[in-house]
Amino acid sequence: MKVLICRDVSSLKLESGNNGKFDLALKDTKNKVDSSIDSLVNSAIGDIRENGYAIVEGAISSTMASDIKRALAPWLQGKQMGRNDFEGFRTERVYALLDKVPQVASLVEHDVILRIVDAFLPLNYLLSSALAINIYPDETPQRFHMDDGDGAMNVRRPHPPIGMSAIWALDDFTSENGATEIVPGSHKWDHERQPDERESITVTMPLGAVLVFGGNVFHRGGANRTGIPRLAITPQYGPPYMRQLENMTLAVPPTVAAQYSERVQALLGYSVDSPGFRGHVNGRHPRLLVDPHYKGRKYRKDLPSS
């Protein structure tokens, strides 16, 4: 089976003029870029609906990937290996990344990825988890699973994705170093069907690419048969009515969240859901915890893109 690659986003980037504003002469070019990105987003959405996943290459530059990797280095010391076979005894996981590595925010709120997620999740969805996964040499494959809980929520398959996941490659993903394996089309299977290894594909992709898929798709971390670790960042997004995997407003307290954009703050949970005022703090909007001057009520759809 062929891996689906929507497009290399890096070719769609434009350098801005002074003060971040595009020169008038670039307006037509910018319109073409916007149109190309719209096309890419629509293509990715179509691939996810049909096959369960999509890959966007060049979503971040190699320089940005290196910067994030460098900022992560103090937390990647081989001291937080998995506690069981599923987590991986040779896999290092670092949680609460937005409390530790601010650069990760650029992945969490990446506009192209959020536009894809927007098509599948309800308004005001939340960041459920954001972690680094570093697969060390001699790690064995995970069991196949779905991020929607693999039956834990008593929802029979097939069903629409309850959550959406992104896996950002901070190293090249190869067939030998623990690249994610995914089962195309498994989001359409009936409840009893389980994956066979022969039905999966290995998602090989270059540094800077991102795999986006529904929580209703079978996948797993692969075996690392090389001599070096393979690093990825994995943000997961979920509906506003469901408890987050990580308790984000404790993991990223107001004093830390204050440095981020309104968009990231809303994803963390410093936001309310409609209808009503679900998520309030003592009857007040939680954004007041990070911005005492906050005046109005905004939903994430009203916030500017990053």
List PLM regions with ranges.
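Non-heme Fe(II)-dependent double-stranded beta-helix
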Residues: 2-51, 56-155
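Short, charged beta-turn/beta-strand-edge "cap" motif at the junction between a beta-strand
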Residues: 217-219
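A structural signal for short, well-ordered beta-strand segments
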Residues: 129-132, 166-168, 233-237
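Short hydrophobic-aromatic micro-motifs
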Residues: 55-56, 168, 211-213
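Aromatic-acidic/polar surface patches that form glycan- and anion
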Residues: 61, 106, 159, 203-204, ...
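Catalytic core of non-heme Fe(II) oxygenases with the double-stranded beta-helix
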Residues: 139-204, 242-252
